[in-house]
């Protein structure tokens, strides 16, 4: 049951990341209170932790790689939206957050 709960939460978190990354910028105003880099890093750190918790036998660094890949894909997709653009800094923030989440999970195992 615990795995199902974390899988549902993970899916919702992914949906929120996709919306926040691809929605028109006007729809996500006010999300930059703590700084864009911190927001990206937190989002992907949380995603990594949630994904690890949703696995029976977690492979932490594979999960980190999947989170980094999602972040890169979303950054690339932003270049196809009207008022968004892909950013290397955002991709680095996503990867940093995923690595922090993975390190936290590895430390807590």
Predicted regions and their residues:
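Membrane-helix interface segments
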Residues: 2-8, 56-64, 87-88
């Amino acid at each position: 049951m615990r795995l199902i709960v974390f899988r549902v939460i993970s899916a919702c978190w992914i949906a929120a990341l996709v919306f926040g990354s691809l929605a028109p910028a006007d729809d996500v105003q006010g999300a930059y209170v703590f700084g864009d880099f911190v927001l990206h890093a937190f989002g992907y750190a949380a995603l990594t932790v949630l994904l690890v918790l949703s696995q029976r036998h977690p492979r932490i660094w594979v999960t980190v790689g999947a989170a980094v890949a999602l972040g890169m894909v979303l950054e690339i997709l932003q270049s196809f939206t009207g008022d968004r653009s892909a950013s290397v800094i955002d991709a680095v923030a996503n990867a940093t957050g995923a690595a922090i989440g993975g390190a936290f999970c590895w430390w807590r195992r």
